[in-house]
Amino acid sequence: MKFSGSHILSVEQFERADIERIFAVADSMEPYALRQKVTRVLEGAILGNMFFEPSTRTRVSFGCAFNLLGGEVRETTGFKSSAIAKGESLYDTARVLSGYSDVICMRHPQEGSVAEFAQASRVPVINGGDGANEHPSQALLDLYTIQKELRDKGRSLDGLRIAMIGDLKHGRTVHSLMRLLGLFANLQVVLVSPEELAMPEEYVELLRGLGHRVDVSSDLANSIGHVDIVYSTRIQEERFGSKEEADLYRGRFRLNQAIYTQFCEPNTVIMHPLPRDSRSDANELDNDLNQNPNLAIFRQTDNGILVRMALFALILDVADQVDKFSRPVNWYHSRTF
């Protein structure tokens, strides 16, 4: 695809070569993310961060990525603090705010809303999550993390074995990740969830139609024994009619160190898009996994900075100029990935 000036709305936009280009640029961003160097390549540019659903990691990560490239960030959070609460349309909001920004990242609870907004925007728009539909930058950073974890073991994305666990019906991160995985070869995917929260059939059929093996199960123990990656998700409480309805599914697929030791291969990598619900009755990753070296959830969040920096650099057509505007940092820094 042509990155310069483009919206990033869906992972369906990408071919394998596009993914490889994004990841190569992401690799080049490490010195800046590690605070070894500073670049001002986007000095004077403004990111409009528009988040109409709660967000910590995605919102702050996009803002941090833009700051690290030398740009400035302006934020709108929640409906109550925006003119949308007064009845303003997405069209009008897009026309106005795209006049204030050079690029916009938007999250909205309604599926398709970010694409609708982008049609009226005069600057590139990145989908930061639209309801239960897609979350392209999360899928990219997840895939980038998987590639790095496998590369450290002398493996590639081709031939990946992955188990996705939890609320696969409402989890937009796994929907986008399923589409991206289809660009690679010889995959084995196990989808583990209650029947009521199963992966939508369109994604299952997509991968099967591309020749990949996709198994569907509700048995956690028998699904995580021979995989490279366990990708856990939280119960998307905000997509249910009530907390009581969501509570029916909590704790059904909780992974802790004892289960990991008993059923997983020793080098199986554990991932999660975060936030994880650490309450004792929740559905996700136990805190006793925190010292497991194969727990990659915080490496994922670090990698999100790299991938989002790469997206900004490509969309604003400065990927080849970042180093020209750089210098060493003059403060103490000690960071690792």
From Swiss-Prot:
Superkingdom classification of source: Bacteria
Q: Which residues form a coiled coil?
A: none
Which Gene3D superfamilies has this protein been placed in?
Aspartate/ornithine carbamoyltransferase
Listed pathway(s)? Pyrimidine metabolism; UMP biosynthesis via de novo pathway; (S)-dihydroorotate from bicarbonate: step 2/3
**Could you say which residues bind L-aspartate here?**
86, 172, 234
Q: Does the keyword GTP-binding apply?
A: no
Supply the Pfam families for this chain.
Answer: OTCace, OTCace_N
| Keyword Transferase listed | yes
Keywords in UniProt for this one? Answer: Pyrimidine biosynthesis, Transferase
- Reaction catalysed by this chain? carbamoyl phosphate + L-aspartate = N-carbamoyl-L-aspartate + phosphate + H(+)
Q: Which InterPro entries does the record associate with it?
A: Asp/Orn_carbamoyltranf_P-bd, Asp/Orn_carbamoylTrfase, Asp/Orn_carbamoylTrfase_sf, Asp_carbamoyltransf, Asp_carbamoyltransf_Asp/Orn-bd
Q: What is its EC number?
A: 2.1.3.2
- Record-annotated residues binding carbamoyl phosphate? 57-58, 107, 135, 138, 274-275
Q: Name one GO cellular component term.
A: cytosol
User: What would be an example GO MF term here?
Assistant: aspartate carbamoyltransferase activity
Q: GO biological process annotations for this chain's record?
A: 'de novo' pyrimidine nucleobase biosynthetic process; 'de novo' UMP biosynthetic process; amino acid metabolic process
In terms of HAMAP family, this protein maps to: Asp_carb_tr (MF_00001)
Quote the function comment for this protein: Catalyzes the condensation of carbamoyl phosphate and aspartate to form carbamoyl aspartate and inorganic phosphate, the committed step in the de novo pyrimidine nucleotide biosynthesis pathway.
Q: How does it assemble?
A: Heterododecamer (2C3:3R2) of six catalytic PyrB chains organized as two trimers (C3), and six regulatory PyrI chains organized as three dimers (R2).
This one is known as Aspartate carbamoyltransferase catalytic subunit
Quote the gene name from the UniProt entry: pyrB
